[in-house]
Amino acid sequence: MRLTLPVLLSTTALFAGTAHAQQAAAEAEADAPIIVTAARTILPPSALPLTIDVVDKETLDQQIAISGSVTDAIATLTPSFSPTRQKLSGAGETLRGRSPLYAINGIPQSTPLRDGARDGFTIDGFFVDRVELIYGSNALQGIGGTGGIVNQVTVGAPQQEGLSGRLLLQGTADNNFHSDGFGWKAGGLFQYKAGDFDATVGAAYEKRGVFYDGQDRRVGLNLTQGETQDSRATNFFARLGYAVSDTGRIDLIASRFELKGEGDFIALPGNRATGLPTSAVHGTPPGKAAANRTESVALSYTDSSFLGGNFISQIFFNRSRDTFGGEVAPIPTFQDPAIAPVNTLFDQSQNRSRKLGAKFSYERAVPGFEALTAILGFDALWDKTEQRLIATNRVWVPPAEFRSLAPFAQTNLKLFDGLVRVAGGARWENVQIKIDDYHTLASTTFVACSPRLPAGTPCGNSTYGGVAVAGGKPKFDDLLLNGGVIVEPWEGVRAYASYAEGYTAPDVGRIARSVNATGIDIDSYLAIEPIVSNNREIGVEVKRGPIDASAAYFWSSSDKGQLLVPGLGRNFDVQRQRIEIQGIEINLRSETPIDGLKLGIGYAHIDGRYDSNADGKVDTDLDGVNISPDRVNLSATFNRGPLSAIVQTQYFLSRRFQGPARAADDANPLRPLKLGDNDFGGYHVTDASIRYQTGFGSLRFSVQNLFDKFYIDYSSDTRLPTDNLAFFAGRGRTFTLSWDYSF
């Protein structure tokens, strides 16, 4: 889709938007400092050479009421974030062209050793107080932050003595009020404070109906990766706290989240040639429905005046179990003639991961040199992940153990009474990955018979068998650096330049399970070396009077990046290639002469390329599985008295993917790979929401896809160009009515 100048001008006159999270709470308490816990410092964001957004509670609840999840809310507000797939799996969803680290109170939810892409659905938004976004590669939270950090901060301790809490009731319906499209949600949070002790307990339950597209057809199901539609989700949450002194506090926080598919529908193939999307019909899919379960417990002790500084400590345990659904047609990857005749064997997989970790940091102004603030810290993480085939109890991805020990230091020097700040730091990562000897699935060595094979080449069922792989303990250690300069010539106006390095482990599971050659030794297997990426950034921010504006140019590279490419069936494999990404993000929001009305606009342009032939030079565009489209965000918000409202439009701009393989495919009259079909056509979607505060709670009415626009989602439009079971339309007009009461 291309935006003409008249369309942009006329739309801008009506709407405006911002990618930066609204700061309603901050505006209500303008003098209260904003502390971003994900940045590992109590210094305000303006003192850091980073692009940071904080999505406050009101904005988050508003967006969740429209779209249904924290992930959708963040993707809507952030132009450089990929549009979500509206599925349980977030595979291919990126921030600035790389995978972000999802965290809850700093506890990593991502499982990079075998990325099940379920990390966006590990807690219900009902229990999230705010979301902190740090953009670009960094190692502030350790492994996983190559695209940035999405830290979900849960509800805080109660501030008033006695009993308080919150209740939520919500109903959702599609445009034509189909009986199978109805959904509902109920949540309750109860808090009690008695002197130094406080307790919080809560539960949330959500039943989602089937989604319908803009042409009143059921949105297709991805049985394997999982769905949020036709599902039930439960979340239990608890927090216990005790103030040991005026400045010291102990907190114990626990959460259990589970989302399960109902298993009432099966997929109906679409037709890419005619533009007919995948749909769904009543039926019972085989095996267990796709599901996601996450359990976490964290114990922390903080003291804001420990030896004159701020001390933070945390130990945590996190366990997840991601069940991938089965397909009606047996999956080729799981076939093994030693178990059952080929094309008759049913199976499905499940990721199992558990983490144990600890974090410590101490921050204070240096005695005798108060302009210099220093932070010393140490992080430790143990992660064990495997992927099993649960119908036949086979191992698909062998258990992989990850161990990280990381001391770090950060400094921030205030010069010329705050006119200039110089910040910098280092983190030493010492990592070990352990994988025992294992045997790959039988299908990894399968060769299909074809007239094109050289004479005498083994093929057919005799080639099933897999290979034995020698395990090992590859190690990695590196010093990850960051630094930057901030200049603030006037209050509310600042410019900054920064450099930061981040790292993550590649998807070791995808790599390990795909080995199909003998003689492989994990200790010397290049493909499992960690991904080290850097982020260079130049930015300007203006927050003065009615204006809230920012602009940032960023570029990053990684010599051994990670690229998802289609494999056997609908599975994706990993390739390690050099990757370079650059982009620009601009946001503007302004108050208007109309009291309570704010307008703004957000724009992001991102280019990403990789080295397709290992010559050290990037030559091919990253496709839609690996990078987001360019986008314009527009919205208008209104807040006055008991009434608040928003109208927002997201324009996802068309994109053509170029490279040698695409050029060769286009030059072939038969177009065997159909790579041109992966070009993105673009689309736009408008949402709206209105809220009124009554004397007994607030009423909110929200509409997703206000004009019932029919479109093919970005992920479907840019991958698997011959797969008619993975051609999904986006959700059509959807109504949500909610009642929210705090006491």
Q: What are the roles of these predicted feature ranges?
A:
Residues 37, 41, 71-111, 135:
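Extracytoplasmic beta-strand/coil segments of soluble accessory domains associated
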Residues 107-137, 188:
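Short acidic/polar hinge/loop motifs at secondary-structure boundaries
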Residues 123-168, 742:
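A beta-strand signature from Gram-negative outer-membrane beta-barrel systems
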Residues 168, 374, 422, 546-559, ...:
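Gram-negative outer-membrane beta-barrel transporters
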Residues 178-213, 217-264, 293-295, 368, ...:
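Transmembrane beta-barrel wall of Gram-negative outer-membrane proteins
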Residues 227-233, 247-304, 320-330, 335-338, ...:
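Flexible loop and strand-edge segments within Gram-negative outer membrane beta-barrel domains
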Residues 300-304, 310-329, 486-488, 494-513, ...:
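Membrane-embedded beta-barrel scaffold of Gram-negative outer-membrane proteins
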Residues 503, 593, 651-667, 691-743:
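C-terminal beta-signal and adjacent terminal beta-strands/loops
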